Amino acid sequence: MINFSEKIYSKVKAIMDTWSESGIYAISFFVYSNEAYQYKNYSNISTFAISYNTEEDCEGADLYDEERWNYAFWRQDETPIIDPDEEPEMTALLFDWYKENGITDIGKEDDDCYDSNFNYIGKGPVGHYELLQIISEVASKLQSEGYVEQHFGKDIPIIIHGLEYAWYDIEATKKANPHGEADIFIKAMKELGMIP
């Protein structure tokens, strides 16, 4: 049985151990799928990279400003964890995990994924939501065991997201921060109208 969660945890923690820049106030777990992303005979696969933002990066933005919380304004200097081009071993392991768990049709999307008000209610392409669940477990473990607070000297949120903040990204972010570490992020995004 593949302990994929533990593999991701070890890789993420090893990278975060190298982060020593001052002023880090948020960690990005960027999980994104795109039809251009391909692995073997699959397309529209999900990738995963991590990064962070600092107070200096957001140039003194107020606590609830978009510049502080919207990833579009961040430095976006990601380190890939799962990527078919840059981290093929982890991508292969992900696909082995999919197979082991009976997840098929990777990358396919349901055409009926919007409600009557045209709100997206789908879970992304097949495999994306399942990967988000593992990543939120990893983030929650980092928070619950006190690693984030010990390493950075304070509680900071781990934000799980794509280019947009879909309902499942917000769900994953809430699970990832079990002690309310992301409450300010959630409130800011609601005030900005970026999430319902």
Pin down the residues of each PLM region.
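N-terminal interaction modules that seed assembly of large macromolecular complexes
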Residues: 20-65
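Low-complexity, serine/threonine/proline-enriched polar segments
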Residues: 56-127
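Well-ordered, non-membrane alpha-helical segments in soluble/globular domains
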Residues: 1-13, 124-143
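Glycine-rich, aromatic-bearing surface loops/beta-hairpins
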Residues: 140-196
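Generic structural signal of hydrophobic/aromatic residues within well-ordered alpha-helices
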Residues: 8, 12, 90, 94, ...
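Short N-terminal edge-element motif at the start of the domain
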Residues: 1-32
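Generic hydrophobic, helix-prone segments enriched in Leu/Val/Ile
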Residues: 64, 69, 131-139, 158
